[in-house]
Amino acid sequence: MNMIEKILAKASGKKEVVPGEVVIAKVNLMVMHDLSANFVTRVFREELGGGSILDPSRIAFVFDHNFSPATEEAARTLHKVRRFAVEYGIKNLFNGGHGSLHHVIIENGLWAPGQIIIGCDSHTPIYGALGVFATGEIGRAHV
């Protein structure tokens, strides 16, 4: 098996996986910047009815797009995401000034080789350079 197959096998509790096989794997971390976090939190509340989050430590929000909001609407967006993080116990909330999403995750050690990370943007696969299976652009509603 290649590296990705090994990671997926371990995360799904299988001895091995093969290309084309559908697996249910444990995701180690979900990463979102402020814009996608706003969408995801709204879908979670309004379309999925809220509820509980199994493990808030496996979620990270990084404000790197509108961290210095130019409009009231942008400020409200950040406020909503902050409120959501507090309400659901999400400690990995990085306000503006920490850097871009994926640098923040790497620099704060929120990853380890062999893990699975998902995100909402096309840069998420950068973690592959660190021995992580990472995929982005899966669709904000799917996170």
Language-model features, listed with the residues they occupy:
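Fe-S-dependent hydro-lyases/dehydratases of central metabolism
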Residues: 1-142
